[in-house]
UniProtKB/Swiss-Prot annotation:
This is Guanine nucleotide-binding protein G(t) subunit alpha-1. The keyword Lipoprotein applies. Residues 340-350 are annotated as: Interaction with RHO. The lineage of its organism: Eukaryota, Metazoa, Chordata, Craniata, Vertebrata. Residues 192-201 are annotated as: G3 motif. GO terms for cellular component: apical plasma membrane; cytoplasm; cytosol; heterotrimeric G-protein complex; membrane; neuronal cell body; photoreceptor connecting cilium; photoreceptor disc membrane.
Length: 350
């Protein structure tokens, strides 16, 4: 009888210990939801977490990006070539017109993700053309990957035999996120589960079941989107869409107690763009100086003023460049400190 009771006690103690361990583990688990409109930079942040908090990209993994990088490069030059027609821009050298036709034909016949020498030669000739450059300058008038200039101006390196993509090449690559991608890593004694959710409108209905028990939402908005329209609706300004989405998330009943951090991303692209295109394109009421600081601050205020519970809920914001590892490292460190302060003070661990 006594032996049975002590075995029961032992079992009970073990169970109690396990429950305590589980509770501690749960308290140390941070669920992070990355939200934002399409092409705002969510997946680039995920890649940075792999570089900063995991072991980065192995040689094999880097090599897997070659096909994506070649595909991105080809799609970018094709988008510019098509825009030459729609924007009625003339080639600087009429011989490039034949190159463009040849490229269109080749694009339909080559194996996807490859870059034959004849094709890379044509692309390099086209990229040097003054008409193509003029068209590239007007990229906000059609859909063009942010990485277009990065890859096209460095194509010679990308097609060198034995080419291995660098971390920056990998970070710049673009694949549309469909569904939900989870990344796990540890940092500052916490276990992070980060969920990247497709941003295009068709993807948004998949978000809902991710909402439960989320510790923190990182909402990503592209600063540089102020003069651009959506891929899925060319009547809607991308910045307006982003504000609309942020409004619905930061005031959602699901997130009453969730920490929200705003990443105003692509600050590098915005820095260059604001010199040429006035912010009033997006915000007709804006009459302040068209500088990086003033215009950037105005955009930040537009987002933060949507928070209906400003008196009790603070939304933290950061200007970010998702392709800059040091910048992301610094900002994520600050975000983690916010999470520790806001969400873990109640559990007695910190």
């Amino acid at each position: 009888m006594g032996a049975g009771a002590s075995a029961e006690e032992k079992h009970s103690r073990e169970l109690e210990k396990k429950l305590k361990e589980d509770a501690e583990k749960d308290a140390r688990t941070v669920k992070l939801l990355l939200l934002g409109a399409g092409e705002s930079g969510k997946s680039t942040i995920v890649k940075q977490m792999k570089i900063i908090h995991q072991d980065g990209y192995s040689l094999e993994e880097c090599l897997e990006f070659i096909a994506i990088i070649y595909g991105n490069t080809l799609q970018s030059i094709l988008a510019i070539v098509r825009a030459m027609t729609t924007l009625n821009i003339q080639y600087g050298d009429s011989a490039r017109q034949d190159d463009a036709r040849k490229l269109m034909h080749m694009a339909d016949t080559i194996e996807e993700g490859t870059m034959p020498k004849e094709m890379s030669d044509i692309i390099q000739r086209l990229w040097k053309d003054s008409g193509i450059q003029a068209c590239f300058e007007r990229a906000s008038e059609y859909q063009l990957n942010d990485s277009a200039g990065y890859y096209l101006s460095d194509l010679e390196r990308l097609v060198t035999p034995g080419y291995v993509p660098t971390e920056q090449d990998v970070l710049r690559s673009r694949v549309k996120t469909t569904g939900i991608i989870e990344t796990q890593f540890s940092f500052k004694d916490l276990n992070f589960r980060m969920f990247d959710v497709g941003g295009q409108r068709s993807e948004r209905k998949k978000w809902i079941h991710c909402f439960e028990g989320v510790t923190c939402i990182i909402f990503i908005a592209a600063l540089s989107a102020y003069d651009m329209v959506l891929v899925e609706d060319d009547e809607v300004n991308r910045m307006h869409e982003s504000l609309h989405l942020f409004n619905s998330i930061c005031n959602h009943r699901y997130f009453a107690t969730t920490s929200i951090v705003l990443f105003l991303n692509k600050k590098d692209v915005f820095f260059e763009k604001i010199k040429k295109a006035h912010l009033s394109i997006c915000f007709p009421d804006y009459d302040g100086p068209n500088t990086y600081e003033d215009a950037g601050n105005y955009i930040k205020v537009q987002f933060l003023e949507l928070n209906m519970r400003r008196d009790v809920k603070e939304i933290y914001s950061h200007m970010t460049c998702a392709t800059d590892t040091q910048n992301v490292k610094f900002v994520f460190d600050a975000v983690t400190d916010i999470i520790i302060k806001e969400n873990l003070k109640d559990c007695g661990l910190f």
